[in-house]
Amino acid sequence: MQCNDVQATEPDIKVSLTRVGVTNLKKLVKLKRKNKRDIVLLPTFEVFVDLPSSQKGIHMSRSPEVIEEVVENILLEKEIYGVEDLSVEIVMKLFEKHEYATRAEVMLYSDYMMEEKSPVTKKDSQEIGKIIARAYGVKDSNGKIDVKKMVGAEVVGITACPCAQNMLKENAVVSLTEKGFSSEDIEKILDSVTIATHNQRGIGTVMIEVPNGYTVGISKIIKIIKDSMSGEVYELLKRSDEAFVVEAAHKNPKFVEDCAREMIKRVVDVFDYLPEDTQVLVRQVNKESIHRHDAFAERNSTIRELRDELKTLTN
């Protein structure tokens, strides 16, 4: 007995849908690297296609089927893959399986293990970051498909609030003055001690478009994010390490806006070889310690726009 293709029938309400698909789909992926051991990931996929108003539903099983096929093919081939290239292949396969689709999108998130050493005692530990890839394809009326891809990372760090620190410094000046210290002595004292403030766990994200013929190193993105906050966080810290991390962060206080702007500047400097119309997304979220809310800053732009703004500021 042949089953009817219910998905291909007309819906009761004839309205198109922008994105239909599956989320929270996990697969084991092994990526090849030149002259290095393979990277094994357990990414979470989100895959979508659009749906015309004339069709009741997408053929839902085809989307996870596409991921399975692409992942299996990677294991058999000798080519070197990046997560962004994996996403592009999935997008192209989605168009093959969903012939009615004019748009297809893939998002990939995965934990990424990094070897770290504590800053003073040099103890080895494993740190976890998150790598992200996105591919988005559009098919025109002639069947031509244009796909854009992005790659990025999300890293946790520490930030120290400049505002509270400045207020405590002013309070210290008043207190020391009342106790009879001279202005010269107060300046020496404040230069010799670390002024307290409240901290945040910062979460920095950078996504960069990868034009055809270009590469964008995830390790470079991770370094940019780490270097743009008040300091790094570590899984393993002995007492001397902990003192170093806290003091270093308090000597480098930053607002959430400072972190975002620092990432922007570093992206423009490090990836100066990318075309000027390359898309860049920078986001910083700081988990507040003395508030119930979080602080947020973001910029979505092109390399050209960011470079021009930075040039204007330096002239």
Curated annotation (Swiss-Prot):
Short name of one Pfam family: GCHY-1
Site residues (May be catalytically important), renumbered to this chain: 161
Keywords: Hydrolase, Iron, Metal-binding
Cofactor: Fe(2+)
The protein's annotated pathway: Cofactor biosynthesis; 5,6,7,8-tetrahydromethanopterin biosynthesis
EC numbers, comma separated: 3.5.4.39
Enzyme type, top EC level: hydrolase
One function term, GO molecular function aspect: GTP cyclohydrolase IV activity
Free-text cofactor note: Binds 1 Fe(2+) ion per subunit.
Catalytic activity: GTP + H2O = 7,8-dihydroneopterin 2',3'-cyclic phosphate + formate + diphosphate + H(+)
One GO process term, biological-process aspect: tetrahydromethanopterin biosynthetic process
UniProt-listed Gene3D superfamilies: Urate Oxidase (3.10.270.10)
Family membership noted in the UniProt record: Belongs to the GTP cyclohydrolase IV family.
Function: Converts GTP to 7,8-dihydro-D-neopterin 2',3'-cyclic phosphate, the first intermediate in the biosynthesis of coenzyme methanopterin.
Quaternary organization: Homodimer.
Name by which UniProt lists this protein: GTP cyclohydrolase MptA
